[in-house]
């Protein structure tokens, strides 16, 4: 292969974190020639902050990434050293999987996936510049001055754009601890007609486990049997399982923190970027919740072959001497040795309202953004965006139409729609409460929602497709069996069934009717003589129970979605000057001109846009012949 051909690609992905790896893998799965540029091959898939995958809302994203053929769930299964199902006592919509991960095992799993993926090349070089011609990106320039050309480029640069690390009143440039920032690229992007702001995030000090007294802490074991993250995974993938621990801050801790606030970069005005609301620093907690006597700390191992632990809950940028005193004031940490100081990092992000649903920028064709550059926080949010951006970069390189999930299809759709419609002024984190259709967007049915779409797009391989079809066939056959299998009230096995129910069976009843009763679970029904044997596949069995038990609620939500779909499919002209529409208030005009929503549905979700304003908008555009339906 000539040197010239080696330097031309269909898709270039800049950055090898959680967004970049999913983007590069997605593009390569579509069969296009893909280059992943990373400043350091050894940090591919690195967990820069907490050593965990999943959680409320986040676990849903991981399942969706997996349903579309992504790598995050598989890597979590291979690296997970403690698995738990959160909200296990609540309804299926809000149940979520979380895995404590071994950092090194996770990186190994990601790197192996990248290095064995056909159509994907990896090159170690930072990116300093974009090649832009006639408002279209055509390539990148590396630190060495090497030029790589491409049809599309995906930027997944994390916290590296103009990164500034703060510990107390001291600060220095960095993309994260130990890594240089991407200042040249940040300067280049600031020269583009895109809105840019600053955000900040932080991380706690790391502690040597042999200096910690775990005996005075509350042990937090994982679930047994352990949940499995990937639809293609199994418990045999899991390494050794170990516990986490819980301890708490106290009034002495809080007084130490308060005494150091005058040297805090957050409270002395040094940091201007807004931090994550749902993962605040310990100094933020003490100030905002001054009446609270203690705060919970999850003491999490960083891996099986390291002595470092991650004290989840005391993220801080206080001076190091204050960090030492606050850590040693905590029960079990009295003799704690800090191996790495906590710090805050400030970085550039770009207003995601300047993005299309495909995550392509509106002003530079072929340029896609994913991850923290869009104002999000979290590995899972980054991975979800990366997959969609990489997919659409590859589709555009093949001259195909873009695809992005709708709000009623996936949490990915909620994430992208929230960002591109509403923007964000603080690091955006996913929660189940953000999804209005969460009864349909469950962890258990992510494959049912997305795998067929992924197959049609080219994201899903033969093995996953075969496994999915086998599961779906089992679910449908078992639902039909329960619907058509009736037990008479005088049958010998009714005694077993009556032991499961609150009110005894008084007439002939089907398995489906029994399973609709809230107190009966599929696994118990399948153990009775009459309805045995049940399904061996626990995922298929879970699906049967949920589909039957919640059928009425699911149908109602599907009807609601059908009503809303009319607005979601009605496209708005872009760009458009909404001042031309008589009757709209100045506030509505300003917001519509600022957001430039792609559809009527997106316009209706902008804060301050009333139903009356939407009606006026529709009437005017219809008269002008400017309304059209999406394909």
From Swiss-Prot:
It holds the Pfam family GIDA. One of its GO terms (molecular function) is flavin adenine dinucleotide binding. GO terms for cellular component: cytosol. NAD(+) binds at residues 275-289. FAD binds at residues 15-20. The keyword DNA repair does not apply. Keywords: Cytoplasm, FAD, Flavoprotein, NAD, tRNA processing. One of its GO terms (biological process) is tRNA wobble uridine modification. It is found in: Cytoplasm. InterPro entries: FAD/NAD-bd_sf, GIDA_C_N, MnmG, MnmG-rel, MnmG-rel_CS, MnmG_C, MnmG_C_subdom, MnmG_C_subdom_sf. SUPFAM superfamilies: FAD/NAD(P)-binding domain (SSF51905). Its cofactor is FAD. Homodimer. Heterotetramer of two MnmE and two MnmG subunits. NAD-binding protein involved in the addition of a carboxymethylaminomethyl (cmnm) group at the wobble position (U34) of certain tRNAs, forming tRNA-cmnm(5)s(2)U34. Belongs to the MnmG family. This is tRNA uridine 5-carboxymethylaminomethyl modification enzyme MnmG.
